[in-house]
């Protein structure tokens, strides 16, 4: 049913549009083939001819079994040519009644004319138009497939929508999850989408690149195929002329022009699109024969009866196979011949160039000899050269011109040699010039950690200490010839290093540490000593040019910009030469972490080594702590001793004071006293003045005056202050005679206690001395 539907569709299309081209028919066939996938297992298992017949079968709508049955004799033709001819004649009658005949009857005039043209093509030939049609068909199918693939590749699809959800089942599953699980799943899908999108973009770019390469290859192959077709046509025409040349003209005309017309309704096993190539071949062969054969119709008719159709088909088949093999052989031979010719040409050119070079060298040698410039003899190779097509006069003029050119080139080369001749080196002869190459210890401290330290200090000079002569140090001028590492780590300024310099003094070389380099300049005696040693040892002195070079190196080292790698290297080197870590606690913590990690990994040896390092670090830290706290302990001991001594001295002073006072209370003017404020009035002061102005009554007999009594009372008071016994306290005299005032009329007012206006605490120095009895 499928085959009938296809045939009916083709017939309807052909009947509706008679002017439709063959390309539209092919596009319709391709669309039908895409809509209905037809199994092609039989076509895949068949040979190359079967695949071509299947394509023709799909186009004609005939069953593939009949095609296979019709093409079977053509496959057996390689074994026996006679059987192939008989079978082909026997199969012509069934082929005429095939469905292709009925289809051809309904085709437009353009398609119906094709079987008539097919009759002119002989069996066994493959036309160019057939291959072109098949290629166009494959290219159209390829373009369709590429367009479909490009359309599929133009959009990225991972099976989820914009909300990162799939079908309804996936939505229900996500809705059934908790919010946290849903967000986690969506986040995973986002990451997966990014990965897949990146991979898809990379694959798309690769596909586009492959398509571009394929298109370039196709365009190149098309050009090559067109070129090969052109060459084949030319070779066929040439071979046809060569093949027809030895034969009689009548025979050649009969073989080429005696073509029996075949019925138009016959469908050949080859493609019906091969007629244009046959027409082109026939035209070329007829044109080639037209120049050879005479225009005689009777002779051509007589020769045509001599050849049979079978003989002619066999000969044509042999010619086709011979053309194929000859093309390959001729191409291979042409390539091999071209390679050999190119190689021979290159060898010949190389030989010519070497010969010319030898001739020029010989001429220069002859010209350099005095008196031989006019007597230059030419070699036989120069006169009888194979590549010289000029006359004898040219050959005679050529050496003269060459001699003149060689002379001029020699003169120019001599002038250039004089200009390029190296100037005589100027050596250092003064101490000032040598001091420009000197490096001090301060600069060594700055350069020792630089990556360019060795290249900077090489060929420089230093003032090195070699020992003492009595109590005076001895220095020598030495040249730096190398940088080495010594076995001792020493301090150089603020850094520690183990580098040393290999120094040269005359012919002697020794290694010195950087700490022995002097900062002072060379003295005159040291310079003279070094100069004398160099002359005796035949050592070349440094040149003036070396000064500029080394000064540039030193300047570059002073302005060197450190990189991250340089800083890491310097830090590592300083840590290697440091006696102890900068932070014991951090170092111990790092070692403990490494030890725990090694224990978890099972590396017990490494853990044991790390434990030993931790113990050593703790021991070193404890030693440093003792050394640091030793001075602190001495100071604290001295402070404690002084404190105890002060306490003892204070106690002794207290005891002595107590022993001196003997329990007496001594008023100290500098101690605080309890005081009470009192109000003072002027009236009381006037009363005191009046009492002082009043005359005192005479003392009773046996009594002293008040002044005397005051002195005596003061003395008693002083003695009483010293003696506090009851007897002394009650041992005092009472004066019963009271003196009366002079003015009897005045009634004395009640005496009020005089107010002390001055505080007891306010004592001047004189009162204090009086109170102490110092005055």
UniProtKB/Swiss-Prot annotation:
Residues 1-370, 385-427, 673-720, 738-775 are annotated as: Disordered. It holds the Pfam family Plus-3. Disruption phenotype: Death at pupal stage. Weaker mutants that live to adulthood exhibit reduced wing width. Residues 225-239 have a biased composition (Basic residues). The modification Phosphotyrosine is found at residue 384. Keywords: Activator, Chromosome, Coiled coil, Notch signaling pathway, Nucleus, Phosphoprotein, Transcription, Transcription regulation. Residues 136-153 have a biased composition (Low complexity). Residues 247-256, 266-288, 709-718 have a biased composition (Polar residues). One of its GO terms (molecular function) is RNA polymerase II C-terminal domain phosphoserine binding. GO terms for cellular component: Cdc73/Paf1 complex; chromatin; euchromatin; nucleus. The modification Phosphoserine is found at residues 49, 51, 53, 269, 271, 385, 388, 390-391, 412-413, 415. GO terms for biological process: Notch signaling pathway; positive regulation of DNA-templated transcription; positive regulation of transcription by RNA polymerase II. Residues 428-559 form the Plus3 domain. It comes from the Eukaryota. Residues 120-129, 154-168 have a biased composition (Acidic residues). Residues 169-224, 306-330, 338-360 have a biased composition (Basic and acidic residues). It is found in: Nucleus, Nucleoplasm; Chromosome. Residues 604-665 form a coiled coil. Interacts with the RNA polymerase II complex. May interact with the PAF1 complex. Plays a role in transcription-coupled histone modification. Required for methylation of 'Lys-4' of histone H3. Plays a role in regulation of transcription. Required for maximal induction of heat-shock genes. Plays a role in Notch signaling in the wing margins. This is RNA polymerase-associated protein Rtf1. The gene is Rtf1.
